[in-house]
Amino acid sequence: MLVVGAGGLGSPVALYLAAAGVGTIGLVDNDVVDITNLQRQLLHGTRDVGRSKLESARDRLHDVNPHVQVVLHASWLTSTNALDIVRNYDVVVDGTDNFATRYLVNDACVLLGIPNVHGSVFRFDGQASVFATSNGPCYRCLYPEPPPADMVPNCAEGGVFGVLPGLVGTIQATETLKLLLALGDTLAGRLLMIDAHSMEFRSLRISRDPACPACGTRTLTQLIDYDQFCGTPGLHTNTEARVEEINPDTLRIWIQNGSPLQLIDVREPTETALGIIAGARCIPLGTLEQQLDSLDRSLRTVLVCRSGVRSARAARQLLSAGFSPVHSLAGGMIRWQED
């Protein structure tokens, strides 16, 4: 089975399935462990901060069950690679936190006839269901169109009650095992809604939509541009296109541990004269393009500015030029000095 996202939802799913003896678990992620992840992403610990989430997850799963085969897909799921990855598994678990990837996972599962075990969390609210079964509805039957991109933050932006991903992820693990073992009645055709604030569970019946663009009469024949569909340009234009932010604590740990990286401050000379992070190289944003050949494209790169805006812009520029991995310091020097 395949888990898309080694974060808050993917953690309990992968742990329970490894413990249950599932032979092969595929993991899709391209992020690193940040200290702010730890209150909800229990695959990872403090010693893993700065590591690849996939490597951290693999080691933790082998602690639980050394016999499980953990297949690592170190990339973001995109329209280009989704079908090639998903087709190798019997069940897909959606542990993502953005609409573009949710629609992508759904459509890939519909095209390949593979069940999609869905879960989502936001603040105190959670949802779970099973989509894309032979007779059941798919995600698009429930949500034909995505909400406006600027109205729906992800977990990092909007926040989530730390234990809620564990609750929803455990439900996803339960549904996955039931699918693999052909046991009981799954959540196919039902949406389970959880309000952790009042600790109420409700179940809503959902039906297959005959007019669904994915599984209905307007049957989907190929994957589309999901960033354009969801109004989130740049999120999945290629496997390295998303700018990853790190917080000051993570950067400090990398520096203290001597992790190989190049630290670039893209502020102007008048700004850097007031102080820089030790070891940083000062390259103003306006001259960055001319300096690209003097930088190591294969070395982890962290970009810094005053507040995080220019560094994010610089990170996108480096990603487009083939640098990987690239990170922007969240909050810039303002947050660095505050912390």
What are these regions (language model features)?
Residues 274-275:
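Cytochrome P450 core scaffold surrounding the K-helix E-X-X-R motif
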Residues 27, 328-329:
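A short, hydrophobic beta-strand element of the alpha/beta-hydrolase
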Residues 241-257:
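A short, well-structured juxtamembrane/interface segment
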Residues 312-327:
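C-terminal structural segments of small proteins and small subunits
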Residues 308:
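Conserved G/P- and acidic residue-centered "switch" motifs that form tight phosphate/ATP-binding loops
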Residues 304, 327-328:
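Conserved active-site loop/cleft motifs that coordinate metal ions or position small ligands
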Residues 1-242, 262, 268-270, 279-290, ...:
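Adenine nucleotide-associated cytosolic modules
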